[in-house]
Amino acid sequence: MSSGQQQPPPPRRVTNVGSLLLTPQENESLFTFLGKKCVTMSSAVVQLYAADRNCMWSKKCSGVACLVKDNPQRSYFLRIFDIKDGKLLWEQELYNNFVYNSPRGYFHTFAGDTCQVALNFANEEEAKKFRKAVTDLLGRRQRKSEKRRDPPNGPNLPMATVDIKNPEITTNRFYGPQINNISHTKEKKKGKAKKKRLTKADIGTPSNFQHIGHVGWDPNTGFDLNNLDPELKNLFDMCGISEAQLKDRETSKVIYDFIEKTGGVEAVKNELRRQAPPPPPPSRGGPPPPPPPPHSSGPPPPPARGRGAPPPPPSRAPTAAPPPPPPSRPGVGAPPPPPNRMYPPPLPALPSSAPSGPPPPPPPLSVSGSVAPPPPPPPPPPPGPPPPPGLPSDGDHQVPTPAGSKAALLDQIREGAQLKKVEQNSRPVSCSGRDALLDQIRQGIQLKSVTDAPESTPPAPAPTSGIVGALMEVMQKRSKAIHSSDEDEDEDDDEDFEDDDEWED
């Protein structure tokens, strides 16, 4: 038995057969024009003629005719190629009941799809070989179709022995008087049979019944894109499956098997609904808006601490409103704006000595600037604008002149501009109190600038989960298997097609 099974494979393998009139290089180029998994069983240089309505032969083209076994399409074709340009000039499929005639040794005719066609061969030897290859192929196909028509158990005749098993026939043959007994037994049997008949009441309702949606998949044509379920279409789009893959016979079979293994269409739909993540993202929290108001409310409290309300500079000259923060720091300090924003907690650290009225608070603060660093937290009541308290000695000259003269205010502004230049030297001097706070603020700014770069694009591997990820993994394995297969393996696969009955359909 083993030897009998090993004999069929050798004839199945088909190799390319070139033309006798072409060089080996031209034959090799011809084989490459055939396409993947296609083999030419015979090749010859020919002229193609077609019969017009006037029953006159007209030349259509010249080239190399090939009897092609097209494994992807599972059919046989007569194809003519132009070996110079590598183009397919004409083709004719070998349909069922195809008849191949040879009125001349070099002139062969057959019925095409639209008209009568003829091949005029350049060499009679090639014409003989080509005709033999075509007729042998047609003969094999004819035998296969006949085998398919005849049932496998056709020659067996079991009916000859059936009459022996029938007791009624034997009684009729040998015993006439027993006919009455037979009729009685028949009536009894009929009565029993009537009792055993099932009614609608005896038929129970179906159990474990599940309605499984139709996937719309056909083994030969793949998925029906016109009637494809929208949810399945969405799944295929998420997985990056193209329409060509859905139409491909083998790839669509892999996808169909995956759907069946996961429980069918309904199970896939339910899984997709479970994994749907759209609801959570829309929640745009309202917390962001509330936090900003507290920051805006922060600035008002500091000025309230300075017995007056707004800082003195604006009260003296409304046009000088922007510069007040700088003059407030005649001493060594960092840029005025940052401390003003961060100052609400340390603002109470104003010196106890500030007898001057509300308008001139900035100068009095400068007088006792030397004492300011130690007691900043405890004395919130002392007057003074939010950030102005500084430690300069220049403020002593301003104490007698805080009458509100614009010249003094301009001097303070100028001094503030000088402080901006000195702030680089003042950073190392800071040791406690407001200066320490300024250093912290500066460090915080540096940290912010450092944290801008590190993180860029982490969110990528999230979507590959659940049924989508499983299907994507299956498709990746499928693509790897396709790309990793060599042409030699493809030829080995072709061996199984020689006697495949599906080609007859």
Swiss-Prot record:
Cellular compartments annotated: Cytoplasm, Cytoskeleton; Nucleus; Cytoplasm
Modification Omega-N-methylarginine occurs at: R307
Residues modified to Phosphotyrosine: Y256
Domain of life (superkingdom): Eukaryota
Disordered: annotated span: 138-163, 185-205, 266-406, 449-468, 477-505
Keywords: Acetylation, Actin-binding, Cell cycle, Cell division, Cytoplasm, Cytoskeleton, Methylation, Mitosis, Nucleus, Phosphoprotein, Repeat, Transcription, Transcription regulation
Composition-biased stretches (Basic residues): 186-198
GO aspect biological process, one term: actin cytoskeleton organization
Modified residues (Phosphoserine): S242, S484, S485
PTM section of the record: Phosphorylation at Ser-242, Tyr-256, Ser-484 and Ser-485 enhances actin polymerization activity.
Listed GO CC annotations: cytoskeleton; endoplasmic reticulum membrane; nucleus
Protein name (record): Actin nucleation-promoting factor WASL
Species per Swiss-Prot/TrEMBL record: Bos taurus
Organism lineage string: Eukaryota, Metazoa, Chordata, Craniata, Vertebrata
This protein's encoding gene: WASL
